């Protein structure tokens, strides 16, 4: 009887508390506690969303919808801590008009060497696809590697960051206070290895449930931010390859919302980056979204559909080369154009060019169905236009690419993303600055991302050495707070290995000493003493702490060859 009263008393007291952070407890929670827990969760989420972290961010769902999907055992994630750090970095650098610029790291060595100089780490999907997938099958960046490939690389780098952070902290705190002050004043303070990781999520690797699972995996593995591009899953290509297919604008917004929803459920502050490839993509997977209609290409005269022409040719025994040639000929002869261009031509031919401005004004922002009604009324007749005839064999629509479609998409993505990434085919500073101006006119202060891609032949674009040197900072002034050389790690790895291998063939150890050891000493590269770099001293310290008399088995004892340095 006393025990029952005690339990009831405990439950009653807990039910009155609003500080319950989990219902996974014993004694088991009451209905009143469950109601209190849910209500507090909703209030916490709403307060979280109202913070400066989410200023200007739009969600198509309520805090109740998030809380009801969270379960009763909330967890915390290290990636969310890193995300808050990343948000603060972007906030400060954005105010200063300075860049957060980084090089893509492909392994722990590159991560540690960039940590003293770059504020973030970037993990490229291209690099993962070509260097290390979870099946060990390497290939071009077609987005067809297992979806856990990049998260696994993030996990690898994040774990390495953890080790080197512990190692650096151990070394730093082993110094006297006076020595730490002295080094700090000399600019030789503790290295921060916990640089926030930004990772490549490609297209999200599937439908919305796949996108959510991928977002969850990234958060669990340590990524502070991910970027999602508006290409079609299954048709994805590297942003600097031809043949890219983009999805409807609304479909990509759904991916962004799915990612945000997943992280809201997890209670993570991770950042969502929306990338558009529409500046160079020439195909669209569906015409379902009216906002894409003005850029879809069609024909203005009845013609046998392209897909039908190709299938007929194949059925008649045409070779692959013959079919490809036939496709090029059809596309060239069809004279494709947008509906607006078709209307302008029709009005001009009908002697009604004075109606063009009226049409463009009335049709602006309208669906193709509505635009057709406006055009037919002004023309006094039906204007023929067929955007289905040019569809590819896969059913994709041809679209007009360029900076205008990219701006329109970026503006549509902006309310749902923390940063906007414009993928371009050339390193055009003026184009990027114009893009930034258009975006920031509607979304003041919006952070932008630029890929300083190695796919560009930088020396062939007319930049002087001084212009190349200032390019990153010039971009930053326009709002491109995040800039990255996505494959710098891959290329620097290749160059260093190529030079060493070439010279080692004929010069033997002289090549190694000249190109590696002497350079490591000159530059102060800590991998010179690779045992210490890998954490041998740190681990010895732990072992000697738990086991006395272990100096004879210490890995860094007098017999270690590293004492030669």
Swiss-Prot record:
SUPFAM superfamilies: Phosphoenolpyruvate/pyruvate domain (SSF51621)
Residues of the active site: 238
Superkingdom in the source lineage: Eukaryota
Group of enzyme by EC: lyase
Cellular component annotations (GO), alphabetically ordered: mitochondrial matrix
Molecular function GO terms recorded: isocitrate lyase activity; methylisocitrate lyase activity
Transit peptide: first to last position: 1-19
Localization per Swiss-Prot or TrEMBL: Mitochondrion matrix
InterPro entries documented for this protein: ICL/PEPM, Isocitrate_lyase, Isocitrate_lyase_ph_CS, Pyrv/PenolPyrv_kinase-like_dom, Pyrv_kinase-like_dom_sf
Keyword entries, A-Z: Lyase, Mitochondrion, Transit peptide
Entry's Gene Ontology BP terms: propionate catabolic process, 2-methylcitrate cycle
Main location as per UniProt: mitochondrion
Activity regulation field: Inhibited in the presence of NADH and NADPH. When Mg(2+) is present, Cu(2+), Hg(2+) and Zn(2+) inhibit the enzyme activity in some extent.
Protein name: 2-methylisocitrate lyase, mitochondrial
Source organism per UniProt: Yarrowia lipolytica (strain CLIB 122 / E 150)
